[in-house]
Swiss-Prot record:
Biased composition (Polar residues): 48-57
Protein name: Large ribosomal subunit protein uL4c
NCBIfam families (UniProt xref): rplD_bact
PANTHER family referenced in this protein's UniProt entry, alphabetically: 50S RIBOSOMAL PROTEIN L4, LARGE RIBOSOMAL SUBUNIT PROTEIN UL4C
Family label: Belongs to the universal ribosomal protein uL4 family.
HAMAP family (alphabetical): Ribosomal_uL4_B
Described purpose of this protein according to its UniProt entry: Probably binds the 23S rRNA.
Length: 215
């Protein structure tokens, strides 16, 4: 059963000062089976990240082994037809992995519902920073560090920054910080959301989330 929930946030500037602007998110949230749906979507996301290129050689693909090692009878040893038998060192692999595609499908409505439910569950960890994409004047890591200090953001925890557009100063300022992930609102996924302990959004990202996932 889905329930409509409303979340309202005040934005802050890069100096940590609270602004008068209010941003509201209207989310459709699953009450009982929400965790199950989130888990399904995370499995779908993780399976899509797999390369699936692992490959082993069978006895017919291993080089060599065309000649019979010794005659069939009279030697006292066990009979052998090829030195590339899976029983031999350097032989082929029995039932080894081969390249394959692993695709787990989830309906678009279910994916949106899982994302909205997780956003609601993480509502207390979300902060909206006004014009984060454009207000970082210097593309330096220390600029972002000072922003985190002003906004009381703990850099020892996983931080997810959701933006409407990736600007070069913001990308350069955050790329050397191991706990920070920068993501477009259009590419938002449950896996990144679940890992994050603190979530920073921009007003443009809130607008995109409303249009893409809450419509």
């Amino acid at each position: 059963m889905t329930v409509q929930k409303f979340i309202t946030y005040n934005s802050v500037d890069i100096n940590g000062k609270t602004l008068s602007d209010e941003y509201k998110l209207e989310l459709n949230v699953l009450e009982k089976s929400g965790n199950y749906l989130i888990h399904k979507d995370i499995l779908r996301h993780q399976s899509s990240q797999r390369q699936g290129t692992i490959s082993t050689k069978t006895r017919s693909e291993v080089r060599g082994g065309g000649r019979k090692p010794w005659r069939q009878k009279g030697t006292g040893r066990a009979r052998a037809g090829s030195s590339r038998s899976p029983l031999w060192k350097g032989g082929g692999v029995i039932f080894g992995p081969k390249p394959r595609k692993i695709i787990l499908k989830l309906n678009k409505k279910e994916r949106k519902l899982a994302l909205q439910t997780l956003l609601y569950n993480k509502r207390n960890n979300i902060s909206i920073i006004d014009n984060l994409e454009t207000n970082l004047d210097l593309p330096k890591t220390k600029t972002f560090y000072s922003l985190c200090k002003n906004c009381e953001i703990n850099l020892d925890q996983k931080i997810l920054i959701i933006v409407g557009e990736k600007t070069i100063p913001l990308k350069l300022a955050t790329r050397n910080i191991k706990n920070v992930e920068l993501i477009l609102a259009s590419n938002l996924n449950t896996f990144s959301l679940l890992k994050a302990k603190q979530i920073l959004m921009t007003p443009l990202a809130v607008k995109d989330i409303k249009e893409i996932y809450c419509g």
